Amino acid sequence: MMASLAAFVDSRRAAGIPIKFVPPGDRDVRYYLSRMGMGKVLDAAEVNHGLPSVNANMALTQRALVEVAAFSSEDDVAALVSIVSYQSVAPGLQRAVSRALLEAGCNVPEHARVPRGFMAGQVINNQLRLSVADAGVGVLSTLEGSGATSEKQALLMAVNGTSEFADADRGRGLKSIHESISTHGGRGALISGQSVVTMSPNRLFAWTGNSSSYAGTILDVVLPIS
């Protein structure tokens, strides 16, 4: 959920709300946060963080790691799309996820009503984990005009292809991910407010009742690598 933390920090900075960051006590966790780029995010928000400096491994970055970074266009999500293409992910799932990422790059300013979202990606234990997040208005606000009356309903509508816009090409990204996970495996979660919809090969399940509410939207996808 590194991308959602970055989006949260960015939104608080934009609102002029003071941010206090307490670095983890575990040295390995501090280095992991630095390697994933959280120090840069906190630096940009002018937050004192105490995270260590690390040297980037460019070869690793190109094939197995995308640091937390802001995006607001298709071009900005190119690094995340590239890591999907590099790994041995089932072609159908690869196409679906790449399409959803590109759609997110285009749509965050329109749908979320914020200038940018945040993304991150990493290969761990033969799985590729991707996260995109924004601290915008949330899925319910976006889809109220399309008939959504609850966060849970809005998330299900989004995963089944409903878009805020009437354009037939809109809203296909999340639906394609759901369909491809059903065929090729993996799992995904779309989170907004206090609600979550999870995607797995055999099930699409939505529920409300998160102990904390996230003001915005998070997409977290885990893809199997063959």
Residue ranges, per PLM feature:
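Flexible, glycine-/charge-rich segments associated with ATP-binding catalytic modules
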Residues: 43-45, 49-54, 161-226
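Amphipathic alpha-helical interaction surfaces in cytosolic regulatory modules
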Residues: 1-43
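ATP-lid-like helix-loop hinge signature
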Residues: 105-144, 200-208
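A short mid-domain helix/strand-loop element embedded in enzyme catalytic domains
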Residues: 69-102, 124-136
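Accessory, usually C-terminal, subdomains that scaffold auxiliary metal cofactors
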Residues: 139-141, 148, 160-166
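Helix-loop-beta hinge of the Bergerat
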Residues: 56-90, 146-161, 179
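A contiguous, low-structure linker/loop signature
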Residues: 27, 31-68
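Conserved ATP-binding N-box helix of the HATPase_c
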Residues: 6-8, 89-123, 174, 178-181
